[in-house]
């Protein structure tokens, strides 16, 4: 039962959400004094884990009937977890996430509410739309990055536009994932590859603007190394398995992208620490489903 409940929250993905928040905190400049108070960082880490976990639990709740046909091994259709229990778990996680955010400040709390609403809209409606769905999912990640920025509320307005970058990246992954069950479109996969390249270019440009391109470059190189080969294999053979591997690589590589953000806006040792979340996420991905 415990493993089934954990599986609903996609533990490997939760680690990537923490990396989002750490990247946002770095963008806000919170780490620059080298003596930041740890409590707000801890509250935001708890908040993002609960918000992400609650969102994906509700994804399975709303998909219960479809999963009974396409993924009968999932916790709800297999009978390991009831819809009622899953709904309660999702609601509790979202409420904890919102509450933890308000422990930091009202701006963080407001963003947490926005994340919860955006994730529920995606789970219930957005994912059924070809273009709205990817943008909606990306919005959740963009807001999550800004949740980190909100550790210094006065920085949110200045950096709100930077949330567009994860929106584009997650939109690309969501486009790819549409073919995970029955196989995908080569045209869609190639378009996603162009969006990947655009994201790398944007992060590199911002790193250069911060005069930190040299620090961020190793992480950008690794980022490309992790995301492009699986995508290229899916382009050559767009089967459900190859597309699933491309999606998994894209999701887990969010940690590498976030390490690049930290390298661009903070300093290399902290970026390396964020990068070290990747082995943990990959280990969890061997035990729990990523998608």
Features from the language model and the residues they span:
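Membrane-embedded alpha-helical segments that form the functional core of polytopic membrane enzymes
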Residues: 17-62, 94-102, 106-122, 160-172, ...
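Multi-pass membrane catalytic core of lipid/isoprenoid biosynthesis enzymes
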Residues: 42-48, 64-119, 138-140, 144-148, ...
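Short, amphipathic, aromatic/basic-enriched membrane-interface segments that mark the entry/exit
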Residues: 7-12, 60, 76-86, 103-108, ...
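Membrane-helix interfacial "entry" motifs
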Residues: 32-40, 104, 126-130, 154-158, ...
